[in-house]
Structure formats: C-alpha cells, structure tokens
Amino acid sequence: MANKLTQPKGSISKETNKEAIARLFGIKKTAVGYISTSVLIDPYTILYDESTETCWYRGTATGTPISWIITNGSLTLQTTSGQFALIKTQVDINLRQEITGEVGYSNIGKVSSVTSLRSIEPTTNGQQIILNQINSTLGTTTGGIFCYDSSDVTSIDDGYTVIVTATGKRWKRPENYIDMAWFGALNPAVDFSDAWDAAVAIVSNYVSNVGFYGRKAIYLKAGTYKPSRQLDIPSYVSVVAIGNVTIDGSGMPDNSYVIRIINKVSGISTTYHKGWNLGSIGGTFRVLGNTLDGNVDGIFVGNTSNMSDVRNVILYGVSIGGVRYGLTFGSINTYLFTATDCHIESTIIGIYVPNTTSSNSGERMTFNDCTIGGSRTNHIQISQPGFDVNFTNCSFDFTSGNVFYGTSTWGYSKVSFTSCHMEGYNGLLLSAESPQSSSVGSNRSIIMNNITNLSRLRSNTTGTNSSSRLHIDAKSTPVYINGLDQRHEVTPYLEDCLMCSDETILYINGYIKDPYFQLPSNTMILNKGYNMGDEVVGTVVNSTATLDALTRYTCVDRNAMSATVITGGTAGTQLQVTGAGGYFNLATKSFIPVTVKNRLGLYLSLSALDSTGNIQCTFSVAWYDVNDNLISTSSASSINMRTVFNDTTLPNYSDGNSRYIATPSRTFNAPVGAVKCKPRWQVSGFTGNINVSRMVSFILAG
C-alpha cells in the first residue's frame, strides 16, 4: 500500500480526483474513470481503484467490471467482455513520494490566469482551484485559491475576487478580507496607486450595491509602497496595515495629499461605520511626504462638496511626517472623527483646519493618546467655525510657533485638552487672533484640565522657561484651566510675571507644583495701586511721623531706610527706596477679603540702580478674622535679588541694573477663620538706591 495515490473520500471528491489525475497524465478529465461494477470502462484511458487508491492503464480491456484482484503489482480484471491484465501506471508509483516530499506543493497544477479560470466550469460546491496570477502584468503575487460557491448567482465578476464562468458559476476567494497584494501591490513593476484604487473600488462598489455590513477590510502587508499620485478612500472603507507599512509620497505631484478620506458619491449611509479607516496591527501605518518644504500634505479627512457624510472616521496607529500639513480637515458633512495612538511630526502645521465653506461639520473631533511634534509654525491651527475638538492624553512636543492657534474666523467652537503634556514651544501655549465679530468671539472657548506645561523654547534658549514669559494670548476668548502643572525652571527676568494677556479671559483653578508661580491674569490682582499709580509723586516716607503717608500702603516698619514716590517716565510711578543696610516694610492699608480655599501669591518688581550689597526681598501675610482680630502671620523665606541681577545666563543680562525684574512669587494658604488679610512686602540689606515698580498680591487658585 506504500505506493497508493491518496485522495479525499466521498462523492464530492471524485470529480476533484479526476481533475488531479488528468493533470498528472496530461489528459482530459473525461479520460479518467473509477473501477466500478456499474460503469463501462471503454471510454477511459486511466482507471482508478478507489479501494487501493491506485491508477491503472486500461489498455485493451473493455466491458463492465465484475471483479478484480491485485497481486504482485498487477491487476487482474474480470469484465462482461472477459479477463484482462492491467499495468500499473508509473505516475502512481512515484506520485505519493512527490506529493509528500518537501517540494510536493509545487507539483500541484495552477490555472494560468483569470481568463483561463473563466473557462473552467466547477461541478461541486466548495470545489477548489489554484490561480497562478490574475495576469502576467500584475504577476504571481496576485494568485491564490478560489472556491466554487454554488449558492451565489448574483456577485459581479470583478476580475480579482469573484470570477464568473460562461455558465454563470462563481469562483470566489475564500478569505474574509481583501489583500492588496491581489492587485499587484507587491509587484515593483506595478504602480501602487493602481493597486490601491482597484482594491478600494471593490469594497466601495460592494457597499454601494449591497450595503456596509458584509464588506471586507483591505489588508496591506508590511513594506514600503511608493504611489505616483494621491490615494483616495471613502469613509466607509478600511485599509489595515499588517506590520510596519510605509506609504512614501515623496514622488507625488505638488499640492497632493498622500491619502484622502473623502466621499465622492451621495446617498450612502455612514451612520454605523465603526471600523478603522486607516489602522495597523502589530506595527505602524506610516505616511511620508517630500519634506516640510515640499508641497505634499499628509492625510485629508472630509468632504469638499455635498456628498455622503464623512462621519465615524477612525485612525489607529497612524504616523504622519515629512509633509507640509500633517492632518487636514474638510468642512462639509465632516464630523465624529477619532484618532488614537497616532503620531504627527515634522510638519509646517500638525493639525490644520482651514476656513472653507462650512456645513454640518466639526462635531466631536477627538484625539486620544496622540503625539504632535516638530511643527514649524503651529501644532494646531483652526480657522473653520464650528469645529469642536478634544485632546485626551496627548503630547505636544517642540514647535517654532504655538501649540494652539485660532485665526480670526475661528468661532462657535470649543477646544479642550485633558491630561495633556505641552513642551518646547517658541510662540505661545494658546494664541488666538481677534475675532471677526463679537458674536464669533463670544462663542469660542478653550478648556484645559490636568495639564503639564514645560514651557522651554524649542531652541532651549536660557531663560525662556521663566515665569516672565507670557503663555496665553487668546483675544476675547474665555480660557478655563482646572489643574495646571506649570513647570517654570528659571527665575523671572522681566518686570511682570503674567501667564496671559490683558485681552484674554482666564479662569483658573488648581495651579500647582511650580517653584516660580505666575500671576495668571491682571484680573486676579487683589490690591489696587499695585503699580504705584495711585501714589502722589514727591511723597516722602522717612520718619516716624510720616510712616503712614502713602495712599494705598502703610509703612509698618523701617530701619536705616527711607522711600520717596517718584515718576519713572515711561516706567510709570515708582517707589525709590534708599538704604544703608537696614530694611523697609510696607503693607496694604485696606483689608483684602480671602477664604480658606484661597492661596495668596505675592511678588514685587524692582530695579537695582546704583545699589550695592544684597537685595533681600521678604513676603508675609497678616491674617484677620471677621472682627478684624489678627489670627496669625505667615512669612516666606527671603529672596536675594542681587543674585538674579548678577545671573549672566539671563537673556537681558547686558541691560545691567537698569532692568526691572520681578521676584519669584511666594504663596500662602489662608488659615481657618481668616476672612481678610494684609499682605506685606519687605526689602532689606542693600546700600544705595533701588526702584520698586510693582507690589502685587493675587489669588493663585480658588
């Protein structure tokens, strides 16, 4: 039995066996027959004995078999016409060894092309056949197994996945996905753009003619692919990278997107699409352009005309880089977008939403666990009205411009950041142009929750990670911050320590973990006259009798020092303090209301002028109850501003002692029972003159 031809059992397999035997002998299937007591053997050349799984030459034997026996490699056959001795075929002797050997699979025959496959009529449901290639142009990577589906009488012959014979029978690929290799994607002689378009067309046509459910995803094997032109995909088609896939768009024409997710037909419901439009399994779906200075953009999502809604688009594990605009959004019927675990880097603008004709767009655009880095101009730039975007657990790393930038046409919109990390921007954290109209400005807002901001410049210039640096200039735009880890690492080197511009409407709560606290907004300053503007020029504080001579402040104590209110020209009204190593201590005349939830911040700004010695600055707060009784006094360690003026690493060191520099802020928590307070500012230790231009108390958080 060692030389038997092993074949599957059952009636369904008989025709398949005949086909296989016919190919081995180079004869027609009709020349192969089974030895059976009910079948006339005269029409056949090769006889197959099913019980021993062996093949025999019929020779001159005729008639219908009655009985047969195999002895010593010979078959004695008794038929209605007599007794005959049949010779065993040589192929039968060698076949088992060839098929079960290491290269046995290569001995199985294949259909040469789709054209040939159309001429082969299947006979049994589930019958399989191997196609060598779609055609010689696309190559052998396009081949594969096809199965006969007798239940299908409607599928269209698409030339790749469904092949229809002359009698209407359908050979179909059994896979539950579409492999872009079937369209020539792995053949370097084939334009990848053609392979992409052909694969996408099959799925798109299925959705158009049959419906979304039942449509297959397109798989793209690991490798690098170089399309010659823009790749388009409807929002209801999925392309999934298996492993690391790179779409190299460096050879594309100017003003192309490497990939556009766009609908070109109307009337297709995209309501229930929830699959990845672009995604990756076990790797990254990488999209490359022709460098930042080229004119090729990354991915476009949206409609440019009134077509089927581009909704529920999902990007997963997609990386975009080396392009002008990383991810661009359209503005017609484009909404409910999600990007997860994606990366956008080395762009002019990372996420770009231009101002075009807008209709039914911008609802719940979401980014989760994404990184946007290396943007030359801005990480995010929005001009389109009505674009609501949410960033959660995202990182924004290094840009020569702003993290977020809203133009004058941006409005009717909310942008939110939750648990995000910002680092290394040369411009601003948040920037917005003045709105085109008051209605636009009043309908836009920015919300930030649990944010970490390491604000050093992309160029990492010394001093730029300082609390002197403005971070927010969102003109007429409310900014709500709840939880900010602002990591300034450099002392102030300018007169003011403002987080936002005067034109920004800022609400902040939970400002934490910063050794150099900023004044969030001028609206949070508690003491009127913080810039000495209310004081009378010429007022002298130099004796016990005149300790209370200032308008807004009381000199509560002094030693070997006196002060005079002077005019500083463009620098404004100032308090010039003259000392000989003593101290000078001012407090507000009026009480400042507080609650136990308040954290009070204090700083002062000064110019060192001709002074020598240490310039010690100390802050304290006297807390009072509802009946004006002193509860306690909180003090902070002193700050030697001489070391700041002598710091050669600060950007404005060359301006010398004429600079006005703010002290680092000191903060105090109101004790239980406190309902009001009087902040105190003290300077001491120097000889000569200094000018004080700011004495600020502010609510840091509430």
Swiss-Prot record:
Q: Which GO terms describe its cellular component?
A: virus tail
InterPro entries named among the record's database cross-references:
Pectin_lyase_fold/virulence
Keywords noted in UniProt:
Degradation of host capsule during virus entry, Degradation of host cell envelope components during virus entry, Host-virus interaction, Viral attachment to host adhesion receptor, Viral attachment to host cell, Viral tail protein, Virion, Virus entry into host cell
The record, for SUPFAM superfamilies, names:
Pectin lyase-like
As for subcellular location, the record says: Virion
GO aspect biological process, one term: symbiont entry into host cell via disruption of host cell envelope
Where is this chain primarily localised?
virion
The function of this protein is: Functions as a receptor binding protein (RBP) and probably mediates the attachment to the host capsular exopolysaccharides. Displays a depolymerase activity that specifically degrades the K11-type polysaccharides of Klebsiella pneumoniae capsule.
Its name, as the record gives it, is: Depolymerase, capsule K11-specific
Which organism is this entry from? Klebsiella phage K64-1 (Bacteriophage K64-1)
Q: What is the lineage of its organism?
A: Viruses, Duplodnaviria, Heunggongvirae, Uroviricota, Caudoviricetes
Q: What's the name of its gene?
A: S1-1
